[in-house]
Amino acid sequence: MSKMAEQKAAAVDGLGGAGAADAAPAGEAAAARVRPVETLLRAAPLGLCVAAMTVMLRDQQSNEYGTVAYSDLGGFKYLVYANGLCAAYSLVSAFYTAVPRPATVSRSWVVFLLDQVFTYLILAAGAAAAELLYLAYNGDKEVTWSEACGVFGSFCRQARTSVAITFGTVLCFILLSLISSYRLFSAYEAPPSSALGSKGVEIAAYPR
């Protein structure tokens, strides 16, 4: 009986090893199929960032009441800087993704963290600029700020276009963050039942 049990265990181990060997090429093939799609997704924010930055840089209006430009408002300047940084990151990350390389947990962590940083960066820039636009259109009676878009309508419309494009960039970066987070955390196995402590506390599993 013991010999039969040992033979069965050896057979199971052999099947497991073969399955693991087959899984590696399958995983590499799947990554090769997904790579062009992810490369395009990472390149898409580049055009949006450049468009939003260009529209805002050209935003200026002069009339009998005076002259106003994007550089007069800190929130709009932050929007320009954030779009410039995100455009550079989009270009670099697209090239990085396009080049085939073995996936490692450390690389997945780097991409995940950078995606998070730039997602929050562009989100904060869009939110700050949107708040400025709200005040420009509606004013603030609490501090006796009057609305300005009735006087500088062209300036406000151009700024609104730039902010709208920026929020399109935000959606792209959110999608990229979801992809990189899935790739990272799918590299970790769920803890087996034996990893539960006596008090039902789970012990973190090691990466594959």
From Swiss-Prot:
<keyword id="KW-1133">Transmembrane helix</keyword>
<dbReference type="InterPro" id="IPR006702">
    <property type="entry name" value="CASP_dom"/>
</dbReference>
<feature type="transmembrane region" description="Helical">
    <location>
        <begin position="79"/>
        <end position="99"/>
    </location>
</feature>
<feature type="topological domain" description="Cytoplasmic">
    <location>
        <begin position="100"/>
        <end position="108"/>
    </location>
</feature>
<feature type="transmembrane region" description="Helical">
    <location>
        <begin position="109"/>
        <end position="129"/>
    </location>
</feature>
<feature type="topological domain" description="Extracellular">
    <location>
        <begin position="130"/>
        <end position="161"/>
    </location>
</feature>
<keyword id="KW-0812">Transmembrane</keyword>
<comment type="subunit">
    <text>Homodimer and heterodimers.</text>
</comment>
<feature type="topological domain" description="Cytoplasmic">
    <location>
        <begin position="183"/>
        <end position="208"/>
    </location>
</feature>
<dbReference type="GO" id="GO:0005886">
    <property type="term" value="C:plasma membrane"/>
</dbReference>
<keyword id="KW-0472">Membrane</keyword>
<keyword id="KW-1003">Cell membrane</keyword>
<feature type="topological domain" description="Cytoplasmic">
    <location>
        <begin position="1"/>
        <end position="36"/>
    </location>
</feature>
<comment type="similarity">
    <text>Belongs to the Casparian strip membrane proteins (CASP) family.</text>
</comment>
<dbReference type="Pfam" id="PF04535">
    <property type="entry name" value="CASP_dom"/>
</dbReference>
<protein>
    <recommendedName>
        <fullName>CASP-like protein 2A1</fullName>
    </recommendedName>
</protein>
<dbReference type="InterPro" id="IPR006459">
    <property type="entry name" value="CASP/CASPL"/>
</dbReference>
<feature type="transmembrane region" description="Helical">
    <location>
        <begin position="162"/>
        <end position="182"/>
    </location>
</feature>
<feature type="transmembrane region" description="Helical">
    <location>
        <begin position="37"/>
        <end position="57"/>
    </location>
</feature>
<feature type="topological domain" description="Extracellular">
    <location>
        <begin position="58"/>
        <end position="78"/>
    </location>
</feature>
